């Protein structure tokens, strides 16, 4: 029920080939390989052969383990692979997270990345998303009083909701690495500085740092041109408060 409430698909972990067959009969859309099954390349290959997305936790995996697991998927034509950075401790200590592994795995193996988190906070998933994670695994418990093997590091539904909200905010603030001249940026130019006429000037007056100054708003000539203006004569009468322009300089 919970996956449908948060807009995600049900994902069930498989443990052997017969489990894969059963999950296929049930219409399972995604296969999840746990950290402790990372070395079972035959299981990985069989699950991958079904053509469904593969999510693989990496808690105990060496680089060789990951290479073999990815190759097992590729060998049956499955390239839809997501590696989850995972610390195989329950609960997992924050200082062992090593989340910089996430962008490294993405670049090193050319796959999608995510995080499988067993820590006691929502910090790891939020940071992981900022580092490029597209999948987050976090345990949920409806009532801690019920107990259970993972109750000590599972989130309540309310805690999970707060984590999802925070992750969505991270996705918004990350944006893109470029410098657009969008409407917001252009409107903010009014708070920058530019060159304006600071004193009334007559034709032939010499430009100095007193009669042409860098002030707000930012709609005048860029301050970088001040050095090109100093010592030059103006070719017309100018009033205090006018925007300075290069065309006002005598040739």
Map each language-model feature to its residues:
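Conserved, mostly hydrophobic/aromatic
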Residues: 23, 57, 83, 132, ...
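Single conserved hydrophobic/aromatic residue that forms the stacking wall/gate
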Residues: 1-7, 11-12
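Catalytic alpha/beta core domains of metabolic enzymes, predominantly
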Residues: 63-176
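Alpha/beta enzyme core
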Residues: 17-29, 37-53, 62, 68-83
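Short beta-strand/loop segments at the ligand-binding rim of alpha/beta enzyme cores
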Residues: 8-9, 28-30, 53, 108-114
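Conserved SET/PR domain catalytic loop and adjacent active-site segment
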Residues: 172-251
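Short beta->alpha connector loops at strand-helix junctions that form conserved
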Residues: 32-35, 57-59, 139-140
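Glycine-rich beta-to-alpha transition loops that act as phosphate-gripper elements at the mouths
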Residues: 13-17, 37-38, 59-60, 115-121
């Amino acid at each position: 029920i919970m996956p449908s409430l948060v807009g995600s698909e049900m994902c069930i972990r498989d443990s052997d080939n017969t489990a894969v067959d059963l999950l296929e009969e049930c219409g399972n859309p995604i296969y999840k390989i746990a950290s402790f099954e990372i070395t079972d390349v035959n299981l990985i290959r069989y699950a991958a052969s079904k053509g469904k997305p593969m999510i693989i936790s990496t808690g105990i995996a060496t680089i060789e383990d990951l290479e073999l697991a990815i190759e097992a998927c590729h060998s049956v034509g499955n390239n839809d692979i997501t590696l989850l950075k995972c610390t195989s401790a329950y609960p997992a200590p924050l200082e062992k997270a090593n989340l910089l592994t996430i962008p490294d795995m993405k670049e090193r193996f050319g796959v999608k990345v995510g995080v499988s988190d067993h820590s006691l906070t929502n910090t790891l998933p939020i940071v992981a998303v900022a580092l490029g994670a597209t999948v987050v695994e976090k345990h949920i418990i409806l009532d801690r009083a019920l107990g259970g093997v993972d109750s000590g590091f599972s989130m309540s539904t309310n805690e999970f909701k707060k984590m999802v909200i925070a992750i969505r905010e991270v996705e918004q603030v990350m944006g893109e690495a470029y410098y657009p001249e969008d409407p917001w940026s252009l409107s903010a130019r009014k708070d920058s500085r530019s060159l304006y006429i600071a004193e009334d000037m007559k034709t032939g007056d010499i430009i100095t740092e007193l009669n042409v100054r860098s002030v707000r708003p930012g709609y005048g000539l860029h301050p970088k041109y001040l050095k090109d203006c100093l010592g030059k004569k103006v070719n017309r009468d100018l009033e205090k408060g006018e925007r300075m322009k290069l065309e006002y300089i005598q040739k």
